[in-house]
Amino acid sequence: MVENQRAMPQPEMRRIRRIHFVGIGGVGMCGIAEVLLNLGYEVSGSDLKGSAVTERLESFGAQIFIGHRAENTIGADVLVVSSAVNTSNPEVATALERRIPVVPRAEMLAELMRYRHGIAVAGTHGKTTTTSLIASVFAAGGLDPTFVIGGRLNAAGTNAQLGTSRYLIAEADESDASFLHLQPLVAVVTNIDADHMATYEGDFNKLKKTFVEFLHNLPFYGLAVMCIDDPVVREILPLVKRPTLTYGFSESADIRAINVRQDGMLTFFTVLRRDREPLDVSVNMPGNHNVLNSLATIAIATDEGVSDEAIVQGLSGFQGVGRRFQVYGELPVDGGHVMLVDDYGHHPREVAAVINAVRGGWPDRRLVMVYQPHRFSRTRDLYDDFVQVLADANVLLLMEVYPAGEEPIPGADSRNLCHSIRQSGQLDPIYIERGVELAPLVKPLLRAGDILLCQGAGDIGGLAPQLLKSPLFAGAKVASTEGKLK
């Protein structure tokens, strides 16, 4: 792929020179900012604190402000905001007062997609991995796509890149219904689950109808690629009045996986496609959920004319995405080592998928899990599901809920989760007070051969690298970006 190339700005946005991002360090914002920089626009942005992301953008020429102030918008032709930013933000308030357009990030993404062959990946779970797989397979096929992903693609070292072809591959975010701005030519729906329900006023039917509306943004000649194994996707399938291609383990799927076998990080399977020879593939990720993500990729790649050789190469050479079952390395313990894994999963279905992947790839190993729930509202709404799935670990340490800006909700916290899991009789979880150093707590619980999984969408993302650097684990082996030990 071509990285950091400079191109001419899009002619349809010729009146726009400087684009300002409010919250530029966010995972959904920085990728769009990087693509716009590489298209030749002036980009500025603000965030509450600096990070590796803002430093990277600054190295490409973006002007970065720490803190939100009215004067940051001077010279901006448009402001791009995420759903987390409201009109009380001083930069937004100033822009509105000066009649500077303020647009959601999805609207800017839609503008980038407008004159390209857009491929949008939607669904409650698996968006980031599926989008990354499609980008990797297209690159292996020589198509050099532009991509905007909600996670760091390890092979590229970034979550966004400007390619030279007509393809733009991006995640479609249902959390705030902003994916309705997008008008792709191909859309994927991986699954539909109860999450971010405040956006849909707690009405699951409204969520389902919104997904149908998203698919009807496709032109009549577009393509909806849908996972037929998901019961809700299967339910809305008859309502979709666009060409469809289904995938899954089901015998009725257009693109189907059989003979699935897992060996540690590697998953092998055979793909059946109508009017084609069976295709044997492997992917460097564990779990049936990643087989489904791969099938969505194969469906689109096949439809776009990518060769089978490129599909096999792109999947087998895939180096993963940051915080999606990311192997950080091995920690030394008495008698051997423990494999250290970090994962972003924060919904019971995602937690279950990862636990099943561990059981499938390493059936003889214990799973020691450090989990941090994300949002009090999610913990409340899915409380019983969390109790059930978290009890499947062999050893469980529960960090306090990461609030993500929410106020505490009575009963929807980790102390209560611990109590409920203990009451089930399957497990005796350990509650971790906020601010407690974890390495001294974790080490005595570990045995040689264990898998230590740190999981959640909050600041637990910093735990795995901290453990690797802890003096208590001196001599730890660090994995490469491919998840292999150096």
UniProtKB/Swiss-Prot annotation:
For this protein, what is any one GO molecular function term?
A: UDP-N-acetylmuramate-L-alanine ligase activity
Q: Could you say which enzyme class this protein belongs to? A: ligase
The UniProt keywords, alphabetically, are: ATP-binding, Cell cycle, Cell division, Cell shape, Cell wall biogenesis/degradation, Cytoplasm, Ligase, Nucleotide-binding, Peptidoglycan synthesis
Keyword Transmembrane applies: no
Query: What is known about what this protein does?
Result: Cell wall formation.
Recorded family membership: Belongs to the MurCDEF family.
Q: What is this protein called?
A: UDP-N-acetylmuramate--L-alanine ligase
Q: Which organism is it from?
A: Pseudomonas syringae pv. syringae (strain B728a)
